[in-house]
């Protein structure tokens, strides 16, 4: 299976897997659910250039991040739904 290497200040995020949701005895279809805004970074670019110097990304592979509701580009890779987003669209890193 091919892998994705994001360029520049982009990262590949695997959105948090939301389990099937029920309200009473009614199953809520995927189309009616809110998109998750939390996920795990599975690949990261090298960083961005500012004034001719490479500035490395603050997030790293393995970080759990929060991102904007409409951030990034959705893709499918190996049967998984993934998101490619810019580091600037990441709102924060979840820590335990």
Curated annotation (Swiss-Prot):
Annotated compartments: Cytoplasm
Protein name as it appears in the record: Co-chaperonin GroES
GO cellular component, one term: cytoplasm
Assembly mode: Heptamer of 7 subunits arranged in a ring. Interacts with the chaperonin GroEL.
Record GO biological process: chaperone cofactor-dependent protein refolding
Pfam families in alphabetical order: Cpn10
GO molecular function: ATP binding; metal ion binding; protein folding chaperone; protein-folding chaperone binding; unfolded protein binding
SMART domains reported for this sequence: Cpn10
Subcellular location, principal: cytoplasm
Keyword list, A-Z: Chaperone, Cytoplasm
Entry keyword Cytoplasm: yes
Coiled-coil ranges (or none): none
InterPro entries given in the database record: Chaperonin_GroES, Chaperonin_GroES_sf, Chaprnonin_Cpn10_CS, GroES-like_sf
Similarity comment: Belongs to the GroES chaperonin family.
Function of the protein: Together with the chaperonin GroEL, plays an essential role in assisting protein folding. The GroEL-GroES system forms a nano-cage that allows encapsulation of the non-native substrate proteins and provides a physical environment optimized to promote and accelerate protein folding. GroES binds to the apical surface of the GroEL ring, thereby capping the opening of the GroEL channel.
């Amino acid at each position: 299976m091919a892998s994705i290497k994001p360029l520049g200040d982009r990262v590949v995020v695997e959105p948090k897997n939301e389990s099937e949701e029920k309200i009473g005895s009614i199953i809520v279809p995927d189309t009616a659910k809110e998109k998750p805004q939390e996920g795990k970074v599975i690949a990261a670019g090298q960083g961005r250039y500012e004034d001719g110097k490479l500035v490395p990304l603050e997030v790293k592979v393995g970080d759990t991040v929060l991102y904007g509701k409409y951030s990034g580009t959705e893709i499918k890779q190996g049967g998984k739904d993934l998101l490619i987003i810019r580091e600037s669209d990441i709102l924060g890193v979840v820590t335990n």
